Amino acid sequence: MVAVVLAVSGMLFTSCVKEGDETIVIPLPDGKIPYSVISESLQDSLLANGFTINEGINPPNIEGVYLAAPLDLHYASDGYSNKFYDLTMTLTGQKMRGMITYSEMQRNTVLGSSIEAQVIGHDSCFTMYCYQYISENSGATQLWKCKIVTVVSGISTDDGFRNCQYSYIMLDREAINDYYLSQLAAYETFRIYYDGDRLAEKIR
């Protein structure tokens, strides 16, 4: 286990915002990631360490199911260096104002869903960001759970996301014991991953 740890939390929580509603958690986008979601200094750190943020108010439609494999660690602000498991990302219900529903899965035991997710970008370039809860269970036992900000960037093509990059920032975490807690990122640290073959394949 261990690699998994993109720090995230236990209760699955999917956005119930409908077309025409105001957002509940994340401000409506103006083509940039709001500093209330990711601070200016953290955005600067992401950029400085190789993560791309595609800004703009006309992002492409990125609905679909995508497989990022292999997902390679590019940078970890907490010094983490272990393996990361392949990631399945599901994006549905994209609205004109950029709202979308996002969920992810690793190894069938690590599941996460967005509270709210939004897409910004231009032409075929996009960045999706959201608050997310993720957890890992073993049978009826929850091993750990976390709350994170997740960010995914890339170029949307018929084959999938080219130059796919995945990052998360830890907001809150808890675990069943010290071992699992030690595998989770510390508060406000972040990790950046690249798809190893530079394509998160569209599988549905």
Stretch-by-stretch model annotation:
Residues 1-3:
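Bacterial N-terminal signal peptides that target proteins for export
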Residues 11-15:
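C-terminal motif of bacterial Sec signal peptides marking the signal peptidase cleavage site
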Residues 73-81, 108-111, 134-146, 170-182:
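Short, cysteine-centered beta-strand-loop-beta hairpins and adjacent loop/turn segments enriched
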